[in-house]
Amino acid sequence: MAGRSMQAARCPTDELSLTNCAVVNEKDFQSGQHVIVRTSPNHRYTFTLKTHPSVVPGSIAFSLPQRKWAGLSIGQEIEVSLYTFDKAKQCIGTMTIEIDFLQKKSIDSNPYDTDKMAAEFIQQFNNQAFSVGQQLVFSFNEKLFGLLVKDIEAMDPSILKGEPATGKRQKIEVGLVVGNSQVAFEKAENSSLNLIGKAKTKENRQSIINPDWNFEKMGIGGLDKEFSDIFRRAFASRVFPPEIVEQMGCKHVKGILLYGPPGCGKTLLARQIGKMLNAREPKVVNGPEILNKYVGESEANIRKLFADAEEEQRRLGANSGLHIIIFDEIDAICKQRGSMAGSTGVHDTVVNQLLSKIDGVEQLNNILVIGMTNRPDLIDEALLRPGRLEVKMEIGLPDEKGRLQILHIHTARMRGHQLLSADVDIKELAVETKNFSGAELEGLVRAAQSTAMNRHIKASTKVEVDMEKAESLQVTRGDFLASLENDIKPAFGTNQEDYASYIMNGIIKWGDPVTRVLDDGELLVQQTKNSDRTPLVSVLLEGPPHSGKTALAAKIAEESNFPFIKICSPDKMIGFSETAKCQAMKKIFDDAYKSQLSCVVVDDIERLLDYVPIGPRFSNLVLQALLVLLKKAPPQGRKLLIIGTTSRKDVLQEMEMLNAFSTTIHVPNIATGEQLLEALELLGNFKDKERTTIAQQVKGKKVWIGIKKLLMLIEMSLQMDPEYRVRKFLALLREEGASPLDFD
């Protein structure tokens, strides 16, 4: 049928605007007919018609969305012709529609069921024409929504014939809605409309993980397991589409607490988590910055941190982006409530404010709070419950594999520019740097670089760089080993100076008793290393004064090659109060728990306890603390060897401390003349003739002297003229009560 010229007009009523039909007079067309409207030779639009008597004959009325879509103006001359749908090819099978609130003032966060919306849509617009790109108004639950047709697929022809579906669907530009057409609603971009139900499209969500993110390039090494655990707990639920999370009834994790020794990568990990996520830039706050001298300002600072997340959640609901807030040194503001002195209670109210913001009455589901501390024991326990900082991750000292990764990261640029010598073996350095933290490994690389650079500085009155040699600058294995020896010592490692003074004269194996002590000590070391059933092994070396107990304990510790060795000695606690002693001992043991393998030597226990026989008197507070520490098993995966020494076994027996040790080893004095002669021969201070003279006096006789006292007597007698040395030595033995004999 040839087209006829008509004039565009305004839709006569609001009710007719909601029908999505063009309105004509019944003298021109009949209701239910479909027409093509041509505004130009290349622009044609399909409409379904309704009749209304108020429309002037020769006019065709359009709603505002229809006029916008077709680019029509009131009074415009257009060509209108009847159109007939081919129902075999143009019945709509599936139609995707973008939806949003029509007016800003009607925006709310109520959920809208897309299944009910789809049924209402089919009922309202059955047997109507729809085109891709068409705009219309849709009324549902007394709300007006703006719709935009995004995509149309024709119905499978087999279904129309009453046959099983073949799955063949063709995209079409214009189609007719029928009773079994399916409608899928898609939320408009940046819309806060909350759609639920199955009749909605899967949203094209931006991946929460930055596609350019790479673990090694980010400069994190040795934290693979920790990071995978954090990802599983905190981010796995955020990677899935919201509809799946909603169906599971799953709530996102809102908080992570990273704790561990200083320099192990807590701050670095938190910073890189922010970079890893496709979220807005994280807010990084140092704990003490929150505090303010004015009343209420500290709490206001907490509220400001969460303000953006609250505003966005109100506006976008479940589709709000992720807001990350990082608290460094969180223990500064989240101490146990009631633990602070003073009447202001500022710290308590700050904790209360933070608790209510993370998981209070008005819950935020678009935040991730990351707290960092090396004192998790100080933090209020309410902050650590599920729903708040529920993921607690220890960032401990890296193992050998982790140290290898960290050293690779810090030497990568040198390797790339051929500044790292071929003799540098990163694996060797990883083995040698036991108990080094990430920061200490970085410091080791810096120290080696400075050692290498120093070789190329001219030694003259001026500081000048030898540019000729600087061109061939190389950081060598020797630079790393020199830095390891002289510059960088691990905070949680073994300081050789601690125990070197105890064995500066070596171990004198004057007889089987000494060998037996060392052999038993080696067995206990192997038990600590290899046994999974006894992660805590403790041994008490007891014996008379000056028998060399401390030296043997230090030797066993040294031979163990454990990465962490500390000596808890009373000479480091002179003048300490009982409480200070307990805290010092606790710190040594706490540090030991952070290492995979640790050895703690508790020297001269009776002195630690302030024991004196007159009274008698001792410190019960220190005794109880020591008993607890001796029996406390290390954390999972850590192993601890404790070596104690005492000269008063009887006193420890009365205090019931002997039972706290796994085993007791007796360290005797030199008891026979033969043992004394063996010690003298090993020491080599006397000549053969002098030793023969001494042997005549002591051989086959009983003596009683500690090896430490023997060394003192030998050194004293050596100060005499050679002809009087032996006589002086024998006299000193008699005076010390080492022998009942009268020596000539």
UniProtKB/Swiss-Prot annotation:
Output the PTM entry. Answer: Phosphorylation at Ser-569 interferes with homohexamerization.
The main place the protein resides is cytoplasm
> Which Gene Ontology cellular component terms are annotated?
cytosol; dendritic shaft; GABA-ergic synapse; Golgi apparatus; Golgi stack; lysosomal membrane; plasma membrane; postsynaptic specialization, intracellular component
> What is the protein's name according to its record?
Vesicle-fusing ATPase
Enzyme Commission code: 3.6.4.6
- What residue ranges carry the coiled-coil annotation? none
- One family name in Pfam for this protein: NSF_ATPase_lid
Gene that this sequence comes from: NSF
**Cofactor(s) needed for function:** Mg(2+)
Keywords carried by this UniProt record: Acetylation, ATP-binding, Cytoplasm, Disease variant, Epilepsy, Hydrolase, Intellectual disability, Magnesium, Metal-binding, Nucleotide-binding, Phosphoprotein, Protein transport, Repeat, Transport
* Keyword hit for Cell division: no
User: What general EC class does the enzyme of this chain belong to?
Assistant: hydrolase
Family stated for the protein in its record = Belongs to the AAA ATPase family.
Q: Where does Mg(2+) bind?
A: 550
